Amino acid sequence: MAKDVKFGIDARKQMMDGVNVLANAVRVTLGPKGRNVVIDKSFGAPTITKDGVSVAKEIELENKFENMGAQLVREVASRTNDVAGDGTTTATVLAQSILQEGMKSVAAGMNPMDLKRGIDKAVRAAVEQIHLLSTPADDSKAIAQVGSISANSDTKIGELIAQAMEKVGKQGVITVEEGSSFEDTLEVVEGMQFDRGYISPYFANKQDSLTAEFENPYILLVDKKISNIREIVPLLEQVMQQSKPLLIIAEDVENEALATLVVNNMRGGLKTCAVKAPGFGDRRKAMLEDIATLTGGTVISEEIGLSLETATLEQLGTAKKVTVGKENTVIVDGAGNSADIENRVESIKRQVEESTSDYDKEKLQERMAKLAGGVAVIKVGAATETEMKEKKDRVDDALHATRAAVEEGVVPGGGVALVRAMNALSELRGDNDDQNAGINILRRAMEAPLRQIVTNSGEEASVVVNEVKSGTGNYGYNAASGEYGDMLEMGILDPAKVARSALENAASVAGLMLTTEVMITDLPQGDDGMAGMGGAGGMGGMGGMGGMM
């Protein structure tokens, strides 16, 4: 296929045009008074959003060179969102500003490689300064404030996230779901819950709720199907002597074994309940091991030389309470050794760090939370489906931002942290004038988020930026109320991780784009096909045939 190739200034100009289209669409959403963006959908009602990354993901441009520029800046937003969960709009504004200043310098004849080196040097100094500015986000109040700001000043969402973290721990799993009412609610599932219910409804001993509830039961964990009752008779007799109920978690319980257990249950003999093990394949084995660690039991597996016929009570787990429903099983207060549980959690945490798949990471984090003791579900309420989608996006953002705040602490929000980090660049010098120009490019760009927040709130950006720069520490501008003051005291915080990631990612992609000299894209199919017909142009001479008449 034939290619279209552009060089130098022409290539960079078209790329910059694409950057401006995307960045100008995204930047209007920044800050507490950011504007809405309406996105048309091929089906259903248009989406209304103030979420920068949602806007960026929708933009595809017709001109392929411009589109390349737009997609590279979209990469900045997506990467920042993946790492920190927020700060996408800030990163986009920073990238656009670095590029605009940088392109002017390149056009003036400066060396793009030295400009990039200067920018990189400045980023390292600014990131160190951001770390020095950060304070730990230990208490619920700080967590609630971060959540509220990320959810576009919705204090209810911030408070719900803080409550959820209090209930399930800062490393616990918190999920966001669509609710069925107008109100936002928080539900916490205590203990370990997995999505498998009883194999037969005849195991239910609470007819009003159709659940099987056991106090202090034994828990048998098996990684194969049980179909022959004779395999488990010796163990059932041992359990019977203890007068305790038995929960069986196996790959499956079927045929004669299932029938015998059900009949025994209905006659009031040994109280039992059989449940299929959660997950599939290797994940099933891992989850059985998790349950074994939580309950202090051992998985009966032929792979390690254990068989059901020789199983003893010591190999069974126990828990304070077990509730088995049609679709879920909850094990509360397992009798496992707390040191073993902590080691298991640490082991899973290492797997999360090594995993490259988002799906695997999510599943590993769920397992970790279940071991740690609970899952919190924030149910988002709204009047319409459009509002529901927009709100759910905001809650997801807020949740990611609060996690980032817990990891690396918080810094003053509203663009102030970046303005203060500029101080680290005032004495910084490069190896030559072009590198110094790169340092100055970043210094000017670091004002851009504050300028945009002020512009979106309808005030004069230059006046506010000069006032903020004249102050020190946490002194900044509250765009929501139009007041100056201590940003931390006013509850305007950003996670340090968000500010750091936005700056690093924006500078990284902008540096690559500044040093771009050639752009290559496919020619449209029509152009390519017509190129071979160029010889037909000679037929224009047929106009002379008019003289033959």
Curated annotation (Swiss-Prot):
Extract one GO cellular component term from the record. cytoplasm
Q: What class of enzyme is it?
A: isomerase
Subcellular location, record wording: Cytoplasm
UniProt keyword annotations, A-Z: ATP-binding, Chaperone, Cytoplasm, Isomerase, Nucleotide-binding
- Secretion signal, residue range per the UniProt entry: none
SUPFAM superfamilies in the cross-refs: GroEL apical domain-like, GroEL equatorial domain-like, GroEL-intermediate domain like
Task: Provide the reaction this enzyme catalyses.
Answer: ATP + H2O + a folded polypeptide = ADP + phosphate + an unfolded polypeptide
**Is Chaperone tagged as a keyword?**
yes
Q: Where does ATP bind?
A: 29-32, 50, 86-90, 414, 478-480, 494
Q: What is its EC number?
A: 5.6.1.7
MF-aspect GO terms = ATP binding; ATP-dependent protein folding chaperone; isomerase activity; unfolded protein binding
**BP terms from Gene Ontology:** protein refolding
What is this protein's function per UniProt?
Together with its co-chaperonin GroES, plays an essential role in assisting protein folding. The GroEL-GroES system forms a nano-cage that allows encapsulation of the non-native substrate proteins and provides a physical environment optimized to promote and accelerate protein folding.
Q: How does it assemble?
A: Forms a cylinder of 14 subunits composed of two heptameric rings stacked back-to-back. Interacts with the co-chaperonin GroES.
| Family note | Belongs to the chaperonin (HSP60) family.
> Sorted alphabetically, which NCBIfam families does this protein's record hold?
GroEL, PRK00013.1, PRK12849.1, PRK12850.1, PRK12851.1
Q: Which HAMAP family match?
A: CH60
The protein depicted here goes by the name Chaperonin GroEL
Gene encoding this polypeptide? groEL
